Structures are given as C-alpha cells and as structure tokens.
Amino acid sequence: MYLEVSERQVLDASDFAFLLENSTSPYDYGENESDFSDSPPCPQDFSLNFDRTFLPALYSLLFLLGLLGNGAVAAVLLSQRTALSSTDTFLLHLAVADVLLVLTLPLWAVDAAVQWVFGPGLCKVAGALFNINFYAGAFLLACISFDRYLSIVHATQIYRRDPRVRVALTCIVVWGLCLLFALPDFIYLSANYDQRLNATHCQYNFPQVGRTALRVLQLVAGFLLPLLVMAYCYAHILAVLLVSRGQRRFRAMRLVVVVVAAFAVCWTPYHLVVLVDILMDVGVLARNCGRESHVDVAKSVTSGMGYMHCCLNPLLYAFVGVKFREQMWMLFTRLGRSDQRGPQRQPSSSRRESSWSETTEASYLGL
C-alpha cells in the first residue's frame, strides 16, 4: 500500500499478491533525480487504520467459510469420482483452487494487522499461490461455460473420446497459464522493511511502467475475458433452454444465471476501482491525496467482495442446486453407516449420469 523512495517503486502486498494497485503516492520515483516531486507522499493514516481493522476480520471469516464450503464441495465430488462428468471435474478443480486461495488469507491478515513475519520465501510462495488460484477460478468458470455451450447449443461433446484424458489436459493447461501469470510474484515479491511504517511487509519491487502493465493484464485476462466468455456462452444456453419444456431445464437455467451473476457481482466493483486507479497512473484522471485515500479504501472494500466469491459458490450449490443437497445428504448417510456392509442409497445409473452432453440435467452440483 506504500511507496518507498528508492530507485525502484516498492508496493505493499497487503491486498494480496495480485493486487498491485495500492500505490499511495502520486509521484513516479524513477531512477533519475528529475523524476522526484518536491511534494511529500500522501499521508496514509486513514486507509491504514481502516485496513488494520477491516481486513483481518474479513480474511478470518472468509478463511473459515471458504475452507468449510469448498471442502464440502470437494468431498461430494470425490465421493462420486468414478462417474464425474467434464463439468464435475472442472468444479472439483475450482473447489481446490478456492481452498488454496483461502489458505493464504491468514498470512495476509497478519500482514495487514501487524507486519509480514513469515520471511521472504513464504512471501513469494503465498503471493504466487494467491495469484495462481485467483486466475484459476476465473479460467475454470470460463471452461465450464464453454463446455456447457458446446454440449447444449451445438450438441457437441469435445470430451466424448478419452474424456478423462482430455479434461485432465485442459486442467493442466489452465494451471500452467496460471503459473505463468504468477511468475512476477516469484520474481518481484520480497519481504521489505518500510522505514515510514517502521514495519516489514510483503512488497513488490516494481518500476511504475511494469506495475501499470501487470495490472492491465490482470484486469483483462483475469476478469474481462473470462466474463465475456461466460456471458456469451450462457446467453446462448439460456436462449436454448427458454424454448425447451420441462421443469428440470428451468432449474438448470436458474443456477446457470446465478453462478455467472455471482462472478460478475463479486468482481466488477473491484475491477472498476482498479480501472480508476490505472487511469490516475497514466494521467487520464488527476491524482490527489483525497482521491487517492478514497480509492485505497474502496479497493479494500471491493477486493473483500471479490474474495467472497470463493465462499459463495458452495452456498449457491447448496441453496439452488437440488442435486448437490441430495449428494451431500447421501454422503453424510454413508459416513453414518460406515460400520455397515455398504451404503443403502446408491444412485441409480440414470441418476449418476451427470454430463450435459446426453441431457440438460445438471452435474452433481446442479450446473
């Protein structure tokens, strides 16, 4: 959240590894003396006090909810792992990504409340891990959307031949791209001592141009492109489902709308604030201390809304997805009868079929 006057711009990563926007000075500290402004950096008391109070409480709550909710989703899917469709497999990877993301939240809660006490190595790992799973969540939702689009709109199953191999390769590509986008975290993140704060924080050592370019990349690749893919695919899916008949199809349509709307509602406010900050960086909008303080607080609040998306998907499955509730109940029943010879309520072959390539019925989670 701060800039250190040096040959390189140093950014605090208290808003996590992928949030490079919390620059609190309007001045570009370059390598040349002429780059320095005669005015001092903006005071940070208001935004700092807000972050120290708001972020640790929020991150702790999201950690508990996200771990329990996504753990339940993973348990349900793994209990049916021999009959998972392509959508179910993507959802399993999405739950894993959300779990790994929320596991970093306690570290960043400590960083926001006190300082970074976990060393430079864990700084790089935690920052990269958060960034990897931020991208993975968006990319996997886009994969689910495209898979449903082909299966419903074009009646095409791209995973019909060797489905597990093809789905696995798709997931490997997704995780590989996420790792590629997280390389700046491994390179530029470090635990740096900030003299103005008298504290050590997990920070980026970034030149201004690199900071702006990476934030634009994250805005486009991590939000706009996945959102456009989801909107396009689900708009065509809804067009097909609306002309169909049957209550089952309308239940599937309802959850489709809710899932894509949740992604948009959770992440749009944050990325709009980031866009404003980018426009101030490039000089399109004037930067002053009052506006900068408001933007910093807005980023803390809206980023919290974005992180809530990790906890929201399991709730959507539970309250909107009928099949998820059924499978969760069956899992609890089997666990309660583990001392018996076997579960008495195994789903029939017709109920176990979850791929939309053969039917518009939802997967195990109702998608």
Curated annotation (Swiss-Prot):
GO cellular component: cell surface; external side of plasma membrane; plasma membrane
Disulfide-linked positions: C123-C202
Reported modifications of this chain: Sulfation on Tyr-27 and Tyr-29 is essential for CXCL10 binding.
Ranges facing Extracellular side: 1-52, 110-124, 189-211, 277-297
Any single biological process term in GO: positive regulation of cell population proliferation
Residue numbers bearing the Sulfotyrosine modification: Y27, Y29
Positions annotated with a glycan in the UniProt record: N22, N32
Annotated localization: Cell membrane
TM annotation in the entry: 53-79, 89-109, 125-146, 169-188, 212-232, 255-276, 298-320
Keyword Cell membrane attached: yes
Signal peptide: none
PANTHER family per the UniProt record, alphabetical: C-X-C CHEMOKINE RECEPTOR TYPE 3, CELL ADHESION MOLECULE
Assembly mode: Homomer. Forms heteromers with ACKR4. Interacts with PF4/CXCL4.
Assigned protein family: Belongs to the G-protein coupled receptor 1 family.
Protein name, UniProt field: C-X-C chemokine receptor type 3
